[in-house]
């Protein structure tokens, strides 16, 4: 009996041990318990040993070759995009990859690996240049999904450090030719604390490259190209090497042509309609003139909204102002015509040299005769003809129209340049003078206004676009 119990116990122990071995084998085959090897353990250990050795006695507060020679920084810039450009704030936005390369002899190492590619965690452990963008208003480094920084160390001590930046940089726009202006917007950088005796920047060959312009947000500008320069700037703290990239931009005129130039031209042309309206239609001509003046005022206000409050006159300001003057002059033309064509009571003009006061002892005219064409009838619907007044063998012309007589200006008033009616054209004052018939002012304006406006446009567009 005891022998049977011992046999059963041995069988149970064997089965239990076998089941445990099967479970262990299954656990070893499961993916969660497998160990993935990304690199040989010896190489991983080699990189760690190299970094530990390089940083063991490294002082990141000191620049390379301090006290021996200046540190040379080679610069590369890759432009992702430019824009938008703000004329009001005098700034533009740019997205770049900024790369700096220099040599640090303290980071030389001997290994089968030529390059150590590291992430942003190593940036704070070594010395990097204190580069600043001198004309930046705001700047932002990209951190999604990780800090957009790259660090590479060569075995000869050369270091490459790149990062992605979005910068709002200042651009002093000269708007004298606006909106036909072109600008060179700079991006300027230098060392913050190291003068040229300690740090020198220089451009690498083909150091500035640009991405495809389809994604750029230059809504009102065309990108014409870029150029880079190097200069020495003297300050109270020393002489600094300053690097500058100029982005050449030319403004597109399409938006301003539609929004400002065409409406202004059409408003000026509309004001000329007044010259073909009868001069006695005072409400119509006055309403048209005031409406066009107010329209030009509104267009002028809208045109200035896209500009900063500069103290000088821009090309658009000049055009809008001249258009306003043309519209205002058209309104004043009718005011002048209406004033000098006013209807007055019938009077007989007397010659100053012929008539005296009744109390005077000199002679008084004793014969006045009125003559009119014999074929004119009171029932005639035509305008009344001119009537000749004979006063002591001196003739005067009066224009009768609807019982109104248009009184000629006195001789002393006519002696300047303007002549109202036929009788004003007689006399010694007309010798060598210009004679303008005010009653024909509309006829003159129909030619003068379009011609002068056409000449102005010719000079304006040729001067700003080609000179």
From Swiss-Prot:
Q: Please give, as recorded in its UniProt entry, the membrane topology of this protein.
A: Multi-pass membrane protein
Which first-to-last residue range defines the signal peptide?
Answer: 1-17
Q: Which CDD domains match?
A: LGIC_ECD_GABAAR_G, LGIC_TM_GABAAR_gamma
PTM note:
May be palmitoylated.
As its record notes, the protein acts as a catalyst of:
chloride(in) = chloride(out)
Q: Which InterPro entries match?
A: GABAA/Glycine_rcpt, GABBAg3_rcpt, GABRG-1/4, Neur_chan_lig-bd, Neur_chan_lig-bd_sf, Neur_channel, Neuro-gated_channel_TM_sf, Neuro_actylchol_rec
Q: Where are the transmembrane segments?
A: 257-277, 284-303, 312-332, 447-467
Q: Name one GO biological process term.
A: gamma-aminobutyric acid signaling pathway
Tagged with keyword Ion transport: yes
Name the SUPFAM superfamilies on file: Neurotransmitter-gated ion-channel transmembrane pore, Nicotinic receptor ligand binding domain-like
What UniProt notes about the protein's domains is: GABAARs subunits share a common topological structure: a peptide sequence made up of a long extracellular N-terminal, four transmembrane domains, intracellular or cytoplasmic domain located between the third and the fourth transmembrane domains.
Subunit structure, per the record? Heteropentamer, formed by a combination of alpha (GABRA1-6), beta (GABRB1-3), gamma (GABRG1-3), delta (GABRD), epsilon (GABRE), rho (GABRR1-3), pi (GABRP) and theta (GABRQ) chains, each subunit exhibiting distinct physiological and pharmacological properties.
Q: Which PANTHER family match?
A: NEUROTRANSMITTER GATED ION CHANNEL
Function field: Gamma subunit of the heteropentameric ligand-gated chloride channel gated by gamma-aminobutyric acid (GABA), a major inhibitory neurotransmitter in the brain. GABA-gated chloride channels, also named GABA(A) receptors (GABAAR), consist of five subunits arranged around a central pore and contain GABA active binding site(s) located at the alpha and beta subunit interface(s). When activated by GABA, GABAARs selectively allow the flow of chloride across the cell membrane down their electrochemical gradient.
Which protein are we looking at? Gamma-aminobutyric acid receptor subunit gamma-3
């Amino acid at each position: 009996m005891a022998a049977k119990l011992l046999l059963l116990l041995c069988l149970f122990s064997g089965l239990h041990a076998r089941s445990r071995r099967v479970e262990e084998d299954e656990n070893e085959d499961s993916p969660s318990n497998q160990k993935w090897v990304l690199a040989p353990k010896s190489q991983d250990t080699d990189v760690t040993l190299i970094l530990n050795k390089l940083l063991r006695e490294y002082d990141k507060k000191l620049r390379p070759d301090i006290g021996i020679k200046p540190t040379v920084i080679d610069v590369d810039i890759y432009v992702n995009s430019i824009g938008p450009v703000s004329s009001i704030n005098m700034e533009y936005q740019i997205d770049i990859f900024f790369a700096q390369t220099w040599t640090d002899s303290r980071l030389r190492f001997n290994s089968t690996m030529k390059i150590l590619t590291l992430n942003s965690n190593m940036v704070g452990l070594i010395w990097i240049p204190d580069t600043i963008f001198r004309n930046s208003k705001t700047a932002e480094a990209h951190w999604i999904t990780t800090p957009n920084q790259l660090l590479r160390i060569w075995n000869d001590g050369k270091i490459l450090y790149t990062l992605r930046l979005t910068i709002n940089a200042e651009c002093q726009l000269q708007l004298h030719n606006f909106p036909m202006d072109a600008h060179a917007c700079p991006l300027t950088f230098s060392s913050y604390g190291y003068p040229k005796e300690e740090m020198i920047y220089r451009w690498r060959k083909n150091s500035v490259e640009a991405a495809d312009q389809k994604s750029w947000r230059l809504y009102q500008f065309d990108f014409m190209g870029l150029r880079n320069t190097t200069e020495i700037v003297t300050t109270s703290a020393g002489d600094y090497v300053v690097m500058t990239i100029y982005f050449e931009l030319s403004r597109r005129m399409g938006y301003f042509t539609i929004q400002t130039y065409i409406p202004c031209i059409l408003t000026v042309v509309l004001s000329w309609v007044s010259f073909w309206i009868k001069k006695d239609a005072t409400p119509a001509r006055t309403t048209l003139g005031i409406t066009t003046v107010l329209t030009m005022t509104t267009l002028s206000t809208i045109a200035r909204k896209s500009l900063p409050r500069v103290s000088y006159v821009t090309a658009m300001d000049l055009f809008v102002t001249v258009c306003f003057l043309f519209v205002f002059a058209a309104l004043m033309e009718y005011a002048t015509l209406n004033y000098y064509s006013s209807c007055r009571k019938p009077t007989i003009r007397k010659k100053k040299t012929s008539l005296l006061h009744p109390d005077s002892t000199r002679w008084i005219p004793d014969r006045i005769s009125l003559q009119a064409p014999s074929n004119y009838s009171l029932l005639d619907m035509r305008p009344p003809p001119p009537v000749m007044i004979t006063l002591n063998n001196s003739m005067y012309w009066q224009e009768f129209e609807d019982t109104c007589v248009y009184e000629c200006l006195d001789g002393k008033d006519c002696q300047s340049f303007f002549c109202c009616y036929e009788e004003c054209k007689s006399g010694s004052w007309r010798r060598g003078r210009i004679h303008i018939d005010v009653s024909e002012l509309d006829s003159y304006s129909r030619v003068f206004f379009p011609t002068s406006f056409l000449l102005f446009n010719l000079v304006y567009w040729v001067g700003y676009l080609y000179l």
